[in-house]
């Protein structure tokens, strides 16, 4: 019997893929409408995304097969959804991020900020969180976590070594950093945790160090997820939202762009980051704030040890190269162009220099990202000069460009590009089949629920759902439904879509919830219960912070207090009874 269950478990992915479509067949066979056919496709894809029986990107290709066969959309129209302006923004933004990562500019920024902030326990946590969050705004959460963790563990090793030396009356002879792999770090952590000590003070110190290492690990992975919400390109769900809004509401006049998103999400990120720092400090360092800020016994030696580790790593980077300076300049230029293209509170360069006959900008954030990334393929990584090829003496060799296609091809997550397209295809299929309207009609009773309560409940639901499945899949499934619901109850669509998009990044409780959590967990020293305990309250804090932001400073940015004309549908009751306000208190 045991062997039978083991065989079923081993082949579970194959069984799910084969049985799931058959199990769901009664829906399209009994209810033979386009709405039912589209619902069948969405439910099938949702379950495959949740179980990951197939790779996420492979499941995202299903609409190309199912929609034409079921008469929902023509194949040519479905395929157009897989490469839209949002996908271009994703590719361009990631190419710039790859250049930053390739030339180690992110590491220089991280170490420089840590040297400025200092290494007292509480400030060390804050420093790592600020740096990780800032980097995660521009490069992938996974890459940021993978880079910051080895730095954090090197500092922790030196802190532990310094503490032992202080207790034994020795000096710490060397602060030279020893690079170690995650496996080696895990072994050291495990050994440090299991070692038997002869005195209670030493055991207490070992326990304190272990708690501090847990806190630092969680600070890094949590701040990577939090930092990603601040910019439109910071994490993929943000781009999913922009793409869904542009697809479902084509007349929205580019309401979600880099500048408007930053004005909404950056303050939210800062507040959530500071609250997360306070919570993790209390949970892992205790409430002895005098000691946490480095005024306890022996803290000066520990501080010097940690500072020396960071200083050594920073020195090993050497002076900034020409490539780093060029990438820095282009990166700053990219951000400036993004902010000034269509800022909203004054005419941007996109509205004035590149406007069509209607006065609308003909360029997008994706145009800017591709422009900057193309420049990186042109500028050489060294100052042009006469240098010989070391392999062929006497033959001149030109330096490679700042960005090469090999580097991009190796580091670009092409699967996410397909996943984005699959989400846009689902949204378009829901609209074409009439499923969106059907769902909206069924959700009209929600108009009797206060809007702020609706946002709170939906954000909690998404935050729970994203713990079990990909945040991209979560937003892809929820956003079209939320858009239909908002139209049905005459609520500004962004009032529910924005908070639920941010809630999809609140994956704090489980190692499998998001790659940064998995990376931290694989380093060792953490149990699932540790992450769940820290992440549970942080999820609650996150949802409350998002609810605060959507009911305060977000209202003037997106004009959430009125139902927009671009959200009207032909059958909407809002045409007959236009609401004066969609937000409580306005």
From Swiss-Prot:
UniProt region (Disordered), positions on chain: 165-209
Source species, domain of life: Eukaryota
Disruption of the gene: reported phenotype: Deficient mice display increased urinary excretion of citrate, alpha-ketoglutarate, fumarate, and malate and a modest increase in succinate. Despite the increased excretion, there is no significant change in plasma citrate concentration. No other phenotypic change is identified in these mice. Transporter deficiency do not affect renal function under normal physiological conditions, nor to response to renal injury.
Tissues where this protein is expressed: Highly expressed in kidney and small intestine. Not detectable in brain, heart, stomach and skeletal muscle.
Main location: membrane
One GO-annotated biological process of the protein: succinate transmembrane transport
Topology of this chain in the membrane: Multi-pass membrane protein
Family: Belongs to the SLC13A/DASS transporter (TC 2.A.47) family. NADC subfamily.
Stored PANTHER family: SOLUTE CARRIER FAMILY 13 MEMBER, SOLUTE CARRIER FAMILY 13 MEMBER 2
Protein name: Solute carrier family 13 member 2
């Amino acid at each position: 019997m045991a062997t039978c269950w083991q065989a079923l478990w081993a082949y579970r992915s194959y069984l799910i893929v084969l049985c799931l479509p058959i199990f769901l067949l009664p829906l399209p066979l009994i209810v033979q409408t386009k709405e039912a056919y589209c619902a069948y496709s969405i439910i099938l894809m949702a379950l495959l995304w949740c179980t990951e029986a197939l790779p996420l990107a492979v499941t995202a290709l299903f609409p190309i097969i199912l929609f034409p066969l079921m008469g929902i959309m023509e194949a040519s129209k479905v395929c157009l959804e897989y490469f839209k302006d949002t996908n271009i923004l994703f590719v361009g933004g990631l190419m710039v991020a790859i250049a930053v990562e390739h030339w180690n500019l992110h590491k220089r920024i991280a170490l420089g900020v840590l040297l400025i902030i200092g290494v007292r326990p509480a400030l060390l946590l804050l420093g790592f969180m600020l740096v990780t969050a800032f980097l995660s705004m521009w490069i992938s959460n996974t890459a940021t976590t993978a880079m910051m963790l080895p730095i954090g563990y090197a500092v922790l090793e030196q802190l532990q070594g310094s503490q032992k030396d202080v207790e034994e009356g020795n000096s710490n002879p060397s602060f030279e950093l020893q690079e170690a792999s995650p496996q080696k770090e895990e072994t050291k952590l495990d050994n440090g945790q299991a070692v038997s000590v002869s005195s209670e003070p030493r055991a207490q110190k070992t326990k304190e160090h272990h708690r501090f290492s847990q806190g630092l690990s969680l600070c890094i992975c949590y701040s990577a997820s939090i930092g990603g919400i601040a910019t439109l390109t910071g994490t993929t769900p943000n781009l999913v939202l922009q793409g869904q809004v542009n697809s479902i509401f084509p007349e929205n006049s580019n309401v979600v762009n880099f500048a408007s998103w930053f004005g909404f999400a950056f303050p939210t990120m800062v507040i959530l980051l500071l609250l997360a720092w306070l919570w993790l400090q209390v949970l892992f360092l205790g409430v002895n704030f005098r000691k946490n800020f480095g005024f306890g016994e022996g803290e000066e030696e520990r501080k010097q040890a940690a500072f020396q580790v960071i200083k050594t790593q920073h020195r090993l980077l050497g002076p900034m190269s020409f490539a780093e300076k060029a990438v820095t300049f282009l990166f700053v230029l990219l951000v400036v162009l993004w902010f000034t293209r269509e800022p909203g509170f004054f005419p941007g360069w996109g509205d004035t220099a590149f406007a069509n006959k209607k006065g609308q900008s003909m360029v997008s954030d994706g145009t800017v990202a591709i422009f900057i990334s193309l420049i990186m393929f042109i500028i050489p990584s060294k100052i042009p000069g006469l240098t010989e090829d070391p392999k062929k003496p006497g033959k001149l060799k030109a330096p490679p460009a700042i960005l090469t296609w090999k580097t991009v091809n190796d580091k670009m997550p092409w699967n996410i590009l397909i996943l984005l397209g699959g989400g846009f295809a689902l949204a378009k299929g829901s609209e074409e089949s009439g499923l969106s309207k059907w769902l909206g009609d069924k959700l009209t009773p929600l108009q009797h629920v206060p809007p702020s309560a609706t946002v709170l409940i939906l954000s909690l639901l998404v935050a729970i759902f994203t713990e079990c499945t990909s945040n991209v899949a979560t937003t892809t499934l929820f956003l079209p439904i939320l858009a239909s619901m908002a139209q049905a109850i005459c609520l500004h669509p962004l009032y529910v879509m924005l908070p639920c998009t941010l809630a999809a990044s609140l994956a704090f409780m489980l190692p499998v919830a998001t790659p940064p959590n998995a990376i931290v967990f694989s380093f060792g020293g953490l149990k699932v219960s540790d992450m769940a305990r820290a992440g549970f309250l942080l999820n609650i804090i996150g949802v409350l912070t998002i609810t605060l932001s959507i009911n305060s400073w977000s209202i003037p940015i997106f004009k959430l207090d009125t139902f927009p004309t671009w959200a009207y549908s032909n059958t909407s009751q809002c045409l007959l009874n236009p609401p004066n306000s969609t937000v409580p208190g306005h």
